[in-house]
């Protein structure tokens, strides 16, 4: 039969979603984080510089990290104002490690306003990379994880990513060497 009449025009669409990605990588040199025998939270390593001497060798800091001016190169500047929606990280183990206790590698984000050297922990940005490590952890093991957020961010704001080992128990000193990449999705 004949084609029927054209229906009414539908409502205006919501428009395209605009996104920006902030990416971190440890580069060619493996990044090593360790967990002392008496600790349940290990030392920090800034993503972006596996050779940084600015790690904290006792507990992961609370709410803030103040970087020396020379270490600002490990933070990235956000290009747009929007909402941080998701963070994803991969860590590839580069050397065989032997763990006597179960531990997780964690990632966390900090932000600082433009012109500031003091970074504040971004609430809700802590997440564990899986699987947990225990026993023999061979080179080539991939740990990954992500977290969903809805945090406001501003153009010019700086972001710092860290990784650290954590365990529910004390035990032998543990360390993990690998390369890390982390990306944060900002929706405009």
Where are the language model's segments positioned?
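Collagen/collagen-like triple-helix recognition
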Residues: 1-20
């Amino acid at each position: 039969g004949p084609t029927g009449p054209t229906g009414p025009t539908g409502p205006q669409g919501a428009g395209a979603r605009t996104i920006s990605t902030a990416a971190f990588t440890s580069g060619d040199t493996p990044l090593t984080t360790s967990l002392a025998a008496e600790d349940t939270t290990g030392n920090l390593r800034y993503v972006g510089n596996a050779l940084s001497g600015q790690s904290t060798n006792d507990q992961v800091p609370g709410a803030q990290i103040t970087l020396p001016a020379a270490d600002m190169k490990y933070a990235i500047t956000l290009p747009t104002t929007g909402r941080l929606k998701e963070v994803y990280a991969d860590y590839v183990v580069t050397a065989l490690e032997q763990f006597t206790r179960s531990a997780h590698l964690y990632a966390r984000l900090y932000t600082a306003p433009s012109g500031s050297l003091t970074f504040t922990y971004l609430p809700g940005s802590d997440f564990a990379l899986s699987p947990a490590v225990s026993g023999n952890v061979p080179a080539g093991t991939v740990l990954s994880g992500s977290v969903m957020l809805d945090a406001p961010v501003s153009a010019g704001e700086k972001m710092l990513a860290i990784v650290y080992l954590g365990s529910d128990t004390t035990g032998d000193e543990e360390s993990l060497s690998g390369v890390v990449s982390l990306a944060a999705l900002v929706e405009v």
